[in-house]
């Protein structure tokens, strides 16, 4: 999902979310074959979907750091793996309490940088055909015009406040940083840094949106980025902004996971 104006406006499960900046849904996409994206995680509060995430280790989920601000203090969200429908009692679902949140760094108000966070599950997931890991890509360079897929339970129309019940996916196109920072696009508000990338659709008909935050951007089968933010949803010159999994972030991730792999 994404938010704009850097304000949280939409109310979901008692948590304010913005319909403009941080994304919660898929615009112009299609429902995926059930359980064909077994790495997807639904981060929920009181059984309501708030953000997406990616299982990268049996006990670790990667997501967007801004998602943390949507959970009231003293109330811990849960992570659901193996889901396709959020509402159905699917036997392959695995639900976990959260042991801790580890953001890359403290998000600054009005900043778009470093929107990445690790979530450690209280217990390890049981890996099977419906729950699998998505490994980090070794390359993070994306050429302008590259076609990529973004997956999530976010809303399917910009004016909706509710998540999609089923997992959806849409193909978006990479937009160069130079163009995304230009006056006709974001005009450096926010600045699209080397740790970020833009992706959207020339007609504004394909996009991530409210609820898709933290989900993966996959290009040619490689996990490149996480859904972060954007201005509203489905606007051609306000494409989705993604946190690129650069070497800096991958080194940080590996350092945090190292103790887990040692056991």
Curated annotation (Swiss-Prot):
Chief location of this protein within or outside the cell: cytoplasm
SUPFAM superfamilies documented for this protein: Trypsin-like serine proteases
Pfam (any one): Trypsin
Record-level GO BP terms: proteolysis
Disulfide bond annotation, renumbered to this chain: 51-67, 148-219, 180-198, 209-233
Subcellular location: Cytoplasmic granule
Keywords: Disulfide bond, Hydrolase, Protease, Serine protease, Signal, Zymogen
Similarity field: Belongs to the peptidase S1 family. Granzyme subfamily.
Official protein name in the record: Granzyme K
